[in-house]
Amino acid sequence: MDRIDVHHHFIPPAYVEAFKTTGGDPSGWHLPQWTPESSLSLMDSHNTRTAILSLTAPGTSILAHSPGASATLAREINLYAAKLHNENPTRFGFFASLPHLTPDTIPAAIEEAIYALETLHADGITLYTRYTGTGYLGHDAFAPLWEELNRRKAVVFIHPTNTAADARNRSILVNPALPQPIIDYPHETCRTAVDLITSGTISRNPDVKIILSHGGGTLPILATRAAHLLYDAKLTSISPEDFLEQARSFYFDLALSGNDENMQLLVGRNGFAKGGHVFYGSDFPYAPVSTINKYVRMMEGFSVQGEEVEKAIARDSAVKLFPRFQMPADLRVGKTNNWGAFSACLLLPVGLSALYSVLQSRVHTYST
């Protein structure tokens, strides 16, 4: 069964250079080695035909101290991602990066989002769970960005980032064996999801499709608790029923979350996620290949809901959200590598258009 990986990171050269000038990842995690070939190798090993690339945290916020530099980095990263897609149209898509978000940089972020979606044909936009100095994604300052994304019916991929930080925005580790991506990131995803609901951002922008990383973090576990406590304590006017409906409107990837317990919670009997709202994700290259392999085996061993749910998670649900990666049915048979044939299908309209232009030119020449 072929897959579409919606949680697959890349590390552009410009991002590596930014890390060198700022002292490394503030989350406490390491910067792995990455090349496009390493992504393709992992994809082939798991029959993944398409990976939608994204920049992990902190993203362009690594240059939060310099808004201009952050905006320049976002553009360089998006151009690099678009180049990878153009060179490998069936294998790579991408979620575009934006400059570090503050109230002052929202206009630049909107400009970059429009450029990425309209000109570079990005598959969506990457946002992080919070931004230093502003807060979580339901903050009033972000409202114009959400309005623009809603107007465009955009897909937004939300990735967690570090929470507690020192004056240099570097993570405060209570235990060096607990880098924030391991434990804290799932909590951050829940926090920003609840913030989006209680701030009214979700209800005001119903046409944005939001993907939460890592199975939604702790949201599926805590949503009912939050829904009732917030309402009963009169901290929100949103009814528990409405709160839970909004919480279930998110999409969820299974990066590092495809174990049996999470699968039962999301897609088992009375699962938290709506049908068609759960996707495969690997978290390559930040997750070790050995860990990715384990989670793939766990997902393949989960069969409570049958083959249709398995196919939906692996590929079909993602195709509905990203139709440009639909593969003709006759090219999906078996496990043969048909990328070249599919590329030919994609490029055929381009060739026909060029042929039409040539013929038109000749007709014009003969007529004169």
From Swiss-Prot:
Reaction it catalyzes: 6-methylsalicylate + H(+) = 3-methylphenol + CO2
Coiled coil, from the record: none
Molecular function terms, GO-annotated: 6-methylsalicylate decarboxylase activity; hydrolase activity; metal ion binding
Biochemical pathway: Secondary metabolite biosynthesis; terpenoid biosynthesis
Main subcellular localisation: membrane
Location(s) in or outside the cell: Membrane
Enzyme class, UniProt record, top EC level: lyase
Protein family according to the UniProt entry: Belongs to the metallo-dependent hydrolases superfamily. ACMSD family.
Protein name: Decarboxylase yanB
Lineage of producing organism: Eukaryota, Fungi, Dikarya, Ascomycota, Pezizomycotina
Gene designation per UniProt: yanB
